[in-house]
């Protein structure tokens, strides 16, 4: 992008479309974008130097704006849809991380999947249902989050099974 006074407003000097893989988190997406930029940097700089670059004007009506990300944005609201929770996991993978609390200790979720399903009305959102072959099953408003790996504050990253076997009281408890 060509530098102008306004933020992210200059003409585009290089652009390439690619499909974002469904399982990408922000770190993986950043690495993919870095690799694309690195592969095309020399060619783009040469075109700028010999003035053969074709500037592409941005359509400012398509611009979107967001707020600054705060650490508290990573706190899971178990009343949200499981799909939204997984999107936040992908978006906040580098910072602030997606986290919840158990026994007043912060747990950072490192890897998880969502399965949409009918839930029992007797289970509470954020309740840990079981450890199964998909991970630690936690009830959401519209299904189950299956945590594959997580990190208790002050500890190393663990797979779901290792975490639960060291903390059997974790199953059936509630996260907040």
Language-model segments: residues:
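Donor/substrate-binding cores of folate-linked one-carbon enzymes
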Residues: 1-72
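Short, flexible active-site loop motifs that bind/organize anionic cofactors or intermediates
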Residues: 19, 75, 153
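Active-site loop ensemble at the mouth of alpha/beta enzyme cores that anchors a bound cofactor
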Residues: 67-68, 73-84
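An anion-binding loop in the catalytic cleft
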Residues: 79-176
């Amino acid at each position: 992008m060509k530098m102008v006074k306004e933020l992210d407003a200059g003409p585009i000097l290089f652009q390439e479309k690619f499909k974002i893989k469904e399982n990408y988190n922000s770190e993986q997406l950043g690495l993919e974008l870095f690799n694309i930029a690195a592969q095309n940097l020399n060619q783009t700089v040469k075109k700028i130097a010999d003035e053969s670059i074709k500037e592409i004007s941005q359509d400012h009506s398509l611009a979107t704006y967001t707020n600054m990300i705060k650490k508290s944005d990573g706190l899971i609201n178990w009343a949200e849809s499981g799909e939204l929770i997984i999107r936040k996991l992908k978006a906040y993978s580098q910072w602030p991380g997606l986290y919840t609390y158990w026994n007043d200790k912060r747990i950072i979720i490192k890897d998880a999947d969502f399965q949409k399903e009918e839930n029992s009305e007797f289970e509470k959102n954020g309740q840990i249902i079981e450890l199964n072959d998909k991970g630690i099953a936690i009830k959401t408003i519209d299904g189950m989050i299956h945590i594959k790996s997580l990190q208790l504050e002050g500890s190393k990253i663990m797979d779901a099974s290792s975490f639960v076997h060291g903390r059997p009281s974790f199953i059936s408890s509630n996260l907040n």
